[in-house]
Structures are given as C-alpha cells and as structure tokens.
A protein has these predicted regions:
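Extended, Lys/Arg-enriched charged tracts that mediate electrostatic binding to polyanionic substrates
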Residues: 92-95, 101-113, 254, 266-285
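A residue-level signal for conserved active-site and pocket-lining positions in enzyme catalytic cores
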Residues: 96, 158, 293, 335
Length: 340
C-alpha cells in the first residue's frame, strides 16, 4: 500500500506533467486534474485557490505570501479569459500600454474588453480584481511577448486611451509614444475612423516628445483628407527634447533618471573617501551580497521539478528551515559570484 508521501509524489508528478506540457501556473479544477489529485495537492499546500474551481501552483508554507499570486497574475488572467471568451478578449487600452511600456506593476483592477463581457467585478486574491467590460474589440489584437495576454497594438492603444491617461500615466505614455517609428499605422486608424479630435491629441503628444516629423505628417495628412484637426497637447508638464527608443526598458530608465536626477544628485557623496581599514571594508562588501540576494529573490512562478518529486516520495522533503536555507544559500551563492 502506498504511503502518504508516495501518494503526494504521484500527484506532484501529474502536476509536473501539466506544467511541462503548457508551462502553466494555473489549474482549472477537474478538467485538468482528477479530484483526488486536486484535493491532495490543495490539502498539502501545492495549490492555492483563487476562485471556485481555479487554482494557482503554490508551495507549502506560502500561505499569506503575495509573491506566488503576483508572479502568477498574468498567467491567471490569460487562462481565465481564454476559458470564458476564447480569443475574443483584450486588455483595456490603458493596460495594453502598461504592457507595451515594460511596466511590472500589477493593477489592482484588471479591465478586459470582450463582446460577451458581463460588466461586473470579480474579486481575486489580495485586493485585486478583474472587470470584463462588454464592448467591441479593436481592429487588431496581438499577444504580449512577455505574458502572452491579449493586448491592443501600440498605435491603436495610444489612440484609444482617455486624455487623462497622458497626465496620470505620463511616464508610460511617453515611453509608448517614443517607441512609434513612423505615422503610417496611426494615420490609417485615424483616417478610417474619422477621429479628428484624437488626431489633434496625437499631434500634440508626438510634438511634446520632440517627434515633430510624425506630428506634422499626421496633421498635414488628416487636414488633406478634409478633417478639422486642432492640435492639443495632452501633457501638463513642459515639452521634452526628442525621445526615440527601440526598447521600452531603455526608455523607462532614461525617463526615470531625467525625472529624478535633481532629487538624487544632492544625496550622492562626491567627496573623496579614504579607506584606512581596507580589510574591514572588503569584509563589509562580502556581507552586502547576502542583503542583495535577500532583497532580489526571484518571483518567478513555482515550478515542480523531478528532484523535488523524488524528495517528497522518499519522505525527505521538509518545507521547513532546512529546505528554505538550501534555497537561500543557492541564491546567495549566485549573487555572490555575480558580485565578484
């Protein structure tokens, strides 16, 4: 007769096979796992319930730890929406721009648009929620390369966000505008929809970040089509010098430094520092890597490994100090080697 450890190892093996198949951190009830495996994994802390019938892969001892949820958030949104709406859904224009800008912040409320959306809030874990808004889908939907969720194209999202977005989310808006290489896609969308007011906002936005060629092209072409386009700057702060980036991460770092440098520079000690105790100073550097490792622990979703299954099967898995210390030691060692 199989021992409890062997039964748990069997369930973990089934879970691992699911993860290996589609790299999923999300389980939808008994459609993917038998009730026996599901209950066993849930009881032992390997699955955490998000909604009735919906689970994310967790680990024992992670109860109350938000890391597992936030690292699984977009996987859950994708799996949940795909199950409810097939491919007929997309993140809101605002959240689409968050994804285009490389933002890693998880919104408290995830707004998705779907023709079959119910216009009601579904509460998720740790104060987050999803709001499926009933509405027409954009002309084109693309996959976010990082999370796989459905998003607006960059150009269509910029056109469709509200004017207040450029004030309330200035950094994201500027990053996304800076990634636009030419006016062709935006012009086609504006002209096809006769969007003269939005065209004026796009002209002002591109001129604000120094992309006068795109701004002039939109203005000239739309007026040539007979539209009464009036340029309006949607930003409140003074205009920028020319911003053009190929990577959202490059744009984010550059713009954040530009915004914060005046506050940071006075805090930097520029005076020459003479180190009398060289040995003590080097010892202090050796200690710093531990703090760096602690504050930089990975928040990737939890993956089941063959080694872990074998430890559980043999009864050697203990979600206590020993296993946690082993993990932290490996992480600290990796950061130490990088620190060198």
């Amino acid at each position: 007769m199989a021992t409890p450890s062997e039964k748990l190892a069997e369930s973990l093996q089934v879970l691992k096979e699911l993860q290996d198949k589609d790299n999923s951190l999300v389980i939808y009830g008994t459609t993917q796992l038998s009730r026996t495996h599901l209950n066993r994994l849930k009881l032992n802390g390997w699955l955490q319930e998000v909604l009735k019938g919906w689970y994310i892969v967790s680990k024992p001892g992670a109860e109350g730890d938000t890391t597992v949820w936030y690292s699984s958030f977009w996987s859950f949104i994708k799996a949940y929406c795909n199950r409810k709406y097939g491919d007929q859904w997309v993140l809101s224009p605002e959240l689409s721009l968050d994804r285009w800008s490389g933002s890693t912040v998880i919104a408290k409320q995830c707004i998705v648009k779907a023709p079959e959306g119910a216009n009601n809030v579904t509460n998720l874990l740790y104060g987050t929620s999803i709001f499926p808004m009933k509405g027409k889908l954009p002309e084109n939907i693309v996959k976010d390369p990082v999370t796989g969720v459905n998003v607006y194209t960059l150009e269509e999202a910029l056109i469709n966000v509200s004017p207040s977005f450029f004030v309330l989310n200035e950094l994201t808006a500027k990053i996304c505008l800076s990634l636009v290489q030419d006016s062709s896609a935006i012009l086609r969308l504006l002209a096809d929809n006769g969007a003269s007011v939005r065209a004026g906002r796009m002209v002002g936005a591109f001129r604000h970040i120094g992309k006068d060629d795109i701004a002039d092209d939109i203005l000239r072409t739309m007026r040539g089509f007979g539209y009464d386009v009036r340029e309006t700057d949607p930003f409140e702060k003074p205009a920028d010098e020319s911003l053009a980036f190929s990577s959202p991460y490059e744009a984010r770092i550059t713009l954040m430094w530009k915004e914060m440098r005046e506050q940071i520079l006075p805090l930097i000690d520029k005076s020459e520092r003479k180190i009398d105790d060289v040995k003590g100073y080097m010892s202090s550097l050796d200690v710093k890597y531990k703090d760096d490792a602690y504050h930089s622990l990975s928040i990737e979703g939890y993956q089941i490994s063959a080694e872990l299954i074998e430890k559980v099967r043999s009864g050697n898995w203990r979600p206590d100090a020993e296993d946690k210390e082993n993990k932290n030691a490996l992480v600290a060692r990796g950061y130490y080697l990088a620190f060198q």
